Amino acid sequence: MPYCPVSPAYATVSKDYDKLRHVIDTLTPGLVFAADGARYGKAIAATVAADVEVILAQGALEGRKAGTFQSLRHTTATPAVDAAMHATGPGTIVKFLFTSGSTKMPKPVINTQRMWCANLQQITLSLPVLAEAPPVLVDWLPWNHTFGSNHNFGLTMMHGGTLYIDDGKPTAALIGETLRNLREIAPTVYFNVPTGFEMIAEAMKTDAQLRANLLSRVRLFFYSGAGLAQPVWDSLHATQEAAIGERIVMCTGLGMTESAPSAMFCNSPDVRSGHIGAPVPGMVLKLVEVDGKTEVRYRGPNVTPGYWRSDAATRDAFDDEGYLCTGDAVKWIDENNIHRGLAFDGRIAEDFKLSTGTFVSVGPMRAKIIVAGAPYIQDVV
């Protein structure tokens, strides 16, 4: 049975519920689960049809019957469960993950068993440290996003690891909870977004307990979602060298919801901010000149077959050779040594043209300004 984790912000921050209504109307679910009736009751009343079953972990809904998660746990398994499991195959849809929808309505990305299983193996082959011992994660990343869901949760499940859910996140109000958790639980691999690493790097300068616990057994730091400024990278390395006498490997790559998510990794020791590396095993890249830049396109077992009930969007997403058009621009790290891989060169769509006819490449310009203004400038918007 396919499922879809939905961003809580669609039901708690939004007042018109436009994106949540779009998700519900697109998927037409037969069952809706919510953690708390009080927190999500208004959103459910506004978007979920009366004939759709609702299950709550706690609380109740005003004027509407809802089942309880506890009651589901007491369901007696029948042979139909085994039959349904054996009927699944590589092409079976396991979940839908919606894109971020920062500029348009989010798109429902089909995630098949083939996509997820293939990508977990691709990631493991690219980062073999993950298979050396069951990983221990301390993780805040949401499961409605491919980084937290497919990548982090999937790797934990594949390798028999342990995932501690971090109720903090990299905001001024909640970073304290993350730091408290990292003082208590020592991860073996640590995943975060650049803002998270920036806050942790700053805290480690003065927090001896954080340094000691976080660096006690971690084998890999990994960031994704945006570029990590080189000054933050350098600060982390300086702290690690002073505390334990060596650097923790910092890794990143490139991917998207449509590639389950990982398409490329830089796992060389000679890596800097902006590097994205080489394709994961089984992934074929196509480099195409678009408006004076080089777009990277994907084809492989981890690439989505398309968007659910969105034929036009699916057609537009692939070129005539079946490659997924990413909109990401890349360039060679070293044109004389292609084995070093690629560097990120911004988004095709974010570039714009001045009235003089000159193209402005926003992504690389941001990185150059941060480097030029270090350590006084940490980010540019």
Predicted regions and their residues:
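Conserved AMP-binding/adenylation subdomain of ANL enzymes
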Residues: C117-V136, W143-L210
